[in-house]
């Protein structure tokens, strides 16, 4: 029998300032992967994390 997938899903967090800021340290967009519990956190996640391209702590929002 196949197991149920469960409520934890893998999500990608992307830097919000890298997309709009042309004057950053290096080209590219910072992305992190993490898991979230779909039952407890139904809305999109937003966490402050370090962005190596901006070289500072920036808000990272959940993308697809």
Swiss-Prot record:
- Quote the Pfam families the UniProt record gives: Ribosomal_L33 (PF00471)
InterPro entries noted in UniProt:
Ribosomal_bL33 (IPR001705), Ribosomal_bL33_CS (IPR018264), Ribosomal_bL33_sf (IPR038584), Ribosomal_zn-bd (IPR011332)
Q: Which GO terms describe its cellular component?
A: cytoplasm; ribonucleoprotein complex; ribosome
Q: Which SUPFAM superfamilies match?
A: Zn-binding ribosomal proteins
Residue ranges of coiled coil: none
Q: Which domain of life is it from?
A: Bacteria
- Cite a single GO BP annotation: translation
What GO terms are given for molecular function? structural constituent of ribosome
Parts of the chain that traverse the membrane: none
Q: Which family does it belong to?
A: Belongs to the bacterial ribosomal protein bL33 family.
The record's annotation in HAMAP family points to: Ribosomal_bL33 (MF_00294)
Q: What is this protein called?
A: Large ribosomal subunit protein bL33
